[in-house]
Swiss-Prot record:
It comes from Mougeotia scalaris (Green alga). Contains one covalently linked phytochromobilin chromophore. This is Phytochrome. Coiled coil: none annotated. Residues 220-399 form the GAF domain. The keyword Repeat applies. Phytochromobilin binds at C325. Keywords: Chromophore, Photoreceptor protein, Receptor, Repeat, Sensory transduction, Transcription, Transcription regulation. The keyword Secreted does not apply. Residues 895-1116 form the Histidine kinase domain. The lineage of its organism: Eukaryota, Viridiplantae, Streptophyta, Zygnematophyceae, Zygnematophycidae.
Length: 1124
């Protein structure tokens, strides 16, 4: 099956493509089924499997929609079941039988109504009350199950035949006409024992397998699949167990296998999509586990009420019949029995697989085969189904992690390609390393630009590439590109001339006639071969068999490459946009000046707002009703709010500087706190960890304070960890009650059912998963009354039924926690989210503990919920909001910082070009001034660590420079604003100033003087003046070192800078009210201090001035003693 589409974003287009592919595939499935049926009716010798698969995919011979619909109906509504059990369908209200399998009378020991008998009570037929066929105790169990919100969650239930007292597993589900009851005989005492403890007990059968899955290291999907097939084989005992993965183009591959040593291996084989028809895939989502006990056993017909308009759906039945083509396939591969389990993961494109499955997709199947008849009891199948849910969770995490790693690789490659474009556009992306072939997986690539062609890897010739471009321009005039896994199917006339080395192509249109291409060869060379490739006879391809399926797959992909994935097309589309942008002309100089000014404005404004957010956060932390503390990298306290002070009895001045571990932590928690600190300082933040702190003063007699803490690494703007902040919740009262409860063990009623506010929400279940405890706090939290909750199943009926969960994964994780507690593995502080009766989301921490009787036997589970106080929730909400504001501003600054780099590079290129031309002295000075201004701007852009400036840790870049160069740059930065205000700008320097060279940080000095000058210009009345005067005095120090003590005066008339602005400059004002100008002046003052200088702002009569005093080492040792 081919996929060709115009280049666009992957979201909606991907969904539409996948839907179209599935519709096309369903038609191919129907054609193949029709061919088999025609062959069977004529004796069966004319059916060639490989050729039929290839023919079914021929788009020139479409099947009528009516025929496809009829095929799908047969797949879901075939009126046959397997013979290992029997089936009845009844009306839910009356229990009147409306359909039954013909073997019911034999299995239940009753007489068909068609046989004359005097005992009509033990006869079965349409209209019979099913309750008359079961024992009285069985009837009550069935009636209770039918009353449940979801009958399937009660499976299995034990029922006895009234006539023979034979025991059956009854598996119930609803379909479109009524209640379907599948009856499977319980053949041994072990089967009965497995049932006696209910569904929860059956899940315990998978406890070891689940524990092993959860203990595996991340990042290895193949290893995960290997383990799951091993564990399924141990649970079920089948000869062969395989993990079968569906690829994006719907074909399948065996990715893991464990088998009997004498069986032929199938690991690595690929299969065409028709091997698992779309209708079967739907059924695998509807009924996630499918067992065939004996494919050679005769099928049993289903008799149904003539008033039912069509054949009854058996999609949800455990005994759905086996179609002839599948029977033949199994027999050809030497298999008699099979067990197939579906594996679902999250679907980001949200194509629903069926009711209740929105957002899930079928990743693949776990397939088991056995050479002799084999029946697996329902409890073991239920355990396997639960194992598949856990496997799906683990697999989903691995798939998402792999996707993240892939996206990061693509982003890194895009960044490198962008850098190459700046140096050598556009040829750099094909002539340097890495190149465009590193962006996505491909065999070759080509760039067609300006009539020239650059080729990489295995690609068409230059003439062929130009011909493809001509075809795209003429045949796809309204698109920006094309992606296809088959140029033949896409309609390129000369596709077959390219051979098997070029089958698939992704093309990105850059301009009207310029393109970037990626090419892929045929998919066959990507296939991992397994077993003998040519050991079979010529006729093997005609028989339905895994090897012939593989041969059919190779035939299907002969002129086709692997499909282009959505993430790859997104990467190509992004590079296409970047390339288009790189061809645009650089904006004119005036626009660049505007951008530079906007950059500086945004830079300072962002600093101001971030500073304001930080100050607000400090105030919030200090006044929060939740205990919050912070430590530096040495583990010493540098933050301690009023709430933690109240709980411990230790005031803020008393605690500052003390060691959290040595001085404040209770001995029982020292190891925990040390580990918590170590991990947080290394960037690994732990949540919901219990610690105990010592108490002092009036609190000392109450014992240690018990806190549930989240550790957050504190970072500076360069992402360096500078400490740890602990946001906590006081759980001392809850813990005392919980400990007391645990000690009592027996008579707990007075505690659990108390209305005391210190009692946390508590609920419990028996060993079968039914609710046996639901305390008042749980009633208040959930909105569900105790009398309504007691007796209901915790999973699916309470949680997942009345109380909705966020998704299917949430229910699976909850079931894992409950089953772990039943196996004596308690869980502490597990994050748990559900919706209460009114639909409000509830986020809690779940702690489980096993319930034991007086003999120590586990009889159920107790669950404790820890809820955050309203004050803490409010504090966290405010914190998240503040963090979002800070993050938005930081991103905006990062964007501006990134976007300004390109025009800066353009300026740099223009200046570098001009430097190599013949220039006058004045022109050389202008070029030099431009270079110093550019250098200053780049340094400001790189300023990410404002905290280092604040604390005096910034590292200066010292070098030799000319003072005259600095002054020229400073004056040039003030010229435009001075001219706009009609100001006279003077620069007063001594005669020998041009020859003065010193050591220091030229860019930082430039930055400071320019900022002082521009502030003076801003606060000078129109038509006034501004003067910058330099007075250097050279001194010779012992040791022959000469220094220049330099006074810089930036003077201006008028009222001068406002007092509040001066207060901001000298940090005498509240940081939250700092203006843009105040923040800039404050940073400049701190930069001066870093250079061991001093700065003042003075008022003398009608003159105001900044006075900057610096001592700078001279570059020459033999300068004159004075230049004044």
């Amino acid at each position: 099956m081919s996929s060709s589409k115009r280049s666009q974003s992957s979201g909606r287009s991907s969904t539409q493509t996948r839907i179209q592919n599935r519709v096309t595939q369903a038609s191919a499935d129907a054609k193949l089924s029709t061919a088999f049926e025609v062959s069977s009716s004529s004796g069966g010798d004319s059916f060639d499997y490989t050729k039929s698969v290839t023919a079914s995919l021929n788009p020139t011979e479409p099947l009528a929609a009516k025929s496809v619909t009829a095929y799908l109906q047969r797949m879901q509504r075939g009126s046959i079941i397997q013979s290992f059990g029997c089936m009845m369908a009844v009306e839910p209200g009356t229990f009147r039988i409306i359909a039954y399998s013909e073997n019911v009378s034999e299995m239940l020991g009753v007489t068909p109504q068609s046989v004359p008998t005097g005992d009509h009570q033990n006869a079965i037929g349409i209209g019979t009350d099913v309750r008359s066929l079961l024992s009285p105790s069985s009837v009550s169990v069935v009636e209770k199950a039918v009353a449940a919100n979801d009958v399937s969650m009660m499976n299995p239930i034990a029922v006895y035949s009234l006539a023979t007292q034979k025991l059956f597993f009854a598996i119930l589900h609803m379909n479109d006409v009524g209640l379907v009851i599948d009856l499977e005989p319980i053949s041994s005492s072990s089967d009965s024992a497995m049932f006696s403890a209910g569904a929860v007990q059956s899940h315990k059968l998978a406890a070891k397998a689940i524990s092993r899955l959860q203990s595996l290291p991340g990042g290895d999907i193949c290893g995960l699949c290997d383990v799951v097939v091993e564990e399924v084989r141990e649970l079920t005992g089948y000869d062969r167990v395989m993990a079968y993965k569906f690829h994006d183009d719907e074909h399948g591959e065996v990715v893991a296998e464990i088998r009997r040593s004498d069986l032929e291996p199938y690991l690595g084989l690929h299969y065409p999509a028709t091997d698992i028809p779309q209708a079967s895939r739907f059924l695998f989502i509807k009924n996630r586990i499918r067992m065939i006990c004996d494919c050679t056993s005769p099928q049993v017909k289903v008799v149904q009420d003539s008033r039912i308009p069509q054949e009854m759906s058996l999609a949800g039945s455990t005994m759905r019949g086996v179609h002839g083509c599948h029977t033949q396939y199994m027999m050809n591969m030497g298999s008699t029995a099979s067990l197939v389990m579906s594996v679902t993961i999250n679907d980001t494109n949200e194509i629903a697989g069926g009711p209740g499955m929105k957002g899930r997709k079928l990743w693949g199947l776990i397939v088991c085969h056995h050479s002799t008849p084999r029946h697996i009891p329902f409890p073991i199948r239920s355990a396997c189904e639960f194992l598949m849910q856990v496997f799906g969770l683990q697999l989903n995490m691995e798939v998402e992690l792999a996707a993240q790693h892939r996206e990061k690789h693509i982003l890194r490659t895009q960044t490198l390609l962008c850098d190459m474009l700046l140096r050598d556009a556009p040829m750099g992306i094909v002539s340097q390393s890495p190149n465009v072939m590193d962006l996505v997986k491909c065999d070759g690539a080509a760039l067609l630009f300006g009539g020239r062609c650059w080729l990489l890897g295995i690609s068409p010739t230059q003439e062929q590439v130009k011909d493809i471009a001509t075809w795209l321009i003429s045949s796809h005039t309204d698109t920006t590109g094309l992606s296809t896994d088959s140029l033949v199917d896409a309609g390129y006339p000369k596709a077959r001339e390219l051979g098997v080395d070029v089958c698939g192509m992704a093309a990105a249109r850059i301009t009207e006639n310029d393109f970037l291409f990626w090419f892929r060869g045929h998919a066959q060379k990507e296939v991992k071969w397994a077993g003998a490739k040519d050991g079979g006879s010529e006729e093997d391809g005609s028989r339905m068999h895994p090897r012939s399926s593989f041969k059919a797959f190779l035939e299907v992909v002969k002129q086709r490459s692997l499909p282009w994935e959505d993430v790859e097309m997104d990467a190509i589309h992004s590079l296409q946009l970047i390339l288009r942008g790189s061809f645009q002309d650089i904006e004119d100089k005036e626009d660049r000046k505007i951008v530079h000014a906007r950059l500086k404005e945004m830079h300072l404004q962002g600093m101001e707002e971030l500073s304001s957010v930080a100050s607000e956060m400090v105030r919030l932390i200090e006044t929060a009703t939740a205990p919050i503390l912070a430590v530096d990298t040495a583990g010493c306290v540098n933050g301690w709010n009023f709430k933690i002070s109240e709980l411990t009895g230790l005031s803020i001045p008393e605690v500052m500087g003390k060691s959290l571990v040595k001085d404040l932590t209770h001995p029982s928690s020292k190891d925990t706190v040390e580990k918590l600190l170590y991990m947080a300082l290394n960037g690994e933040e732990e949540q919901n960890v219990e610690i105990r702190l010592k108490t002092w003063g009036m609190q000392q007699g109450k014992g240690p304070v018990i806190l549930m803490v989240n550790a957050c690494a504190s970072r500076d703007v360069s992402e360096k960890v500078v400490g740890v902040c602990f946001v906590a919740q006081d759980v001392t009262g809850e813990k005392i009650v919980q400990d007391k409860f645990t000690r009592i063990q027996g008579d707990y009623t007075t505690i659990v059912r108390s209305h005391n506010s210190l009692i946390p929400p508590i609920f419990g279940s028996d060993e079968s998963g039914f609710c046996v405890e639901w305390n008042p706090a749980m009633e208040r939290l959930s909105g569900v009354k105790r009398e309504e909750a007691i007796g209901k199943m915790l999973t699916r009926e309470l949680f997942g039924g009345i109380l909705r969960l966020k998704n299917v994964d949430g229910l699976t994780k909850f079931m894992i926690v409950l089953n772990a507690a039943m196996s004596s593995h308690d869980t502490d502080k597990f994050p748990f989210t559900f919706y209460d009766r009114s639909g409000k989301i509830v986020e809690v921490l779940l702690t489980t503990s096993k319930r034991c009787n007086s003999e120590g036997v586990v009889t159920g589970v107790f669950c404790f919920l820890h809820t955050a106080s309203s004050e803490l929730q409010q504090a966290l909400t405010v914190q998240k909001a503040a963090e979002r504001v800070a993050e938005v501003k930081a991103k905006e600054l990062a964007y501006i910082r990134q976007e300004i780099q390109n025009p800066l590079d353009g300026i740099h290129f223009a200046r570098s070009f001009m430097e190599h031309t013949v220039l006058s002295e004045d022109q050389k000075q202008l070029i030099e001034t431009s270079a110093t201004c550019e250098k200053q701007l780049r340094r400001i852009l790189a300023d990410m660590d404002l905290a280092s400036i604040e604390k005096g840790y910034l590292e200066l870049e010292t070098g030799e420079f000319s003072m005259a160069t600095v002054m020229n740059s400073v004056v040039s930065q003030g010229m435009i604003q001075s001219t706009q205000k009609n100001l006279q700008l003077y620069c007063d320097t001594p005669p020998d100033f041009k020859s003065l060279s010193v050591f220091g940080d030229q860019v930082r000095l430039q930055q400071v003087l320019a900022d002082f000058l521009l502030n003076a210009v801003q606060f000078t009345p129109p038509s006034g003046w501004v003067e910058i005067k330099v007075e250097p005095v050279v001194k010779k120090l012992p040791g022959g070192v000469s220094v220049a003590n330099v006074d810089f005066r930036v003077s201006h008339p008028g009222e001068g800078l406002p007092e509040d602005l001066i207060d901001q400059m000298f940090d005498r004002a509240d940081a939250r009210v700092k203006s843009q100008e105040g923040l800039g002046l404050s940073i400049c003052r701190k930069l001066v201090r870093l250079m061991n200088g001093e700065v003042q702002y003075r008022r003398e009569g009608e003159r105001n001035f900044f006075l900057l005093q610096l001592e700078l080492p001279l570059a020459q040792r033999d300068d004159q003693a004075s230049m004044k």
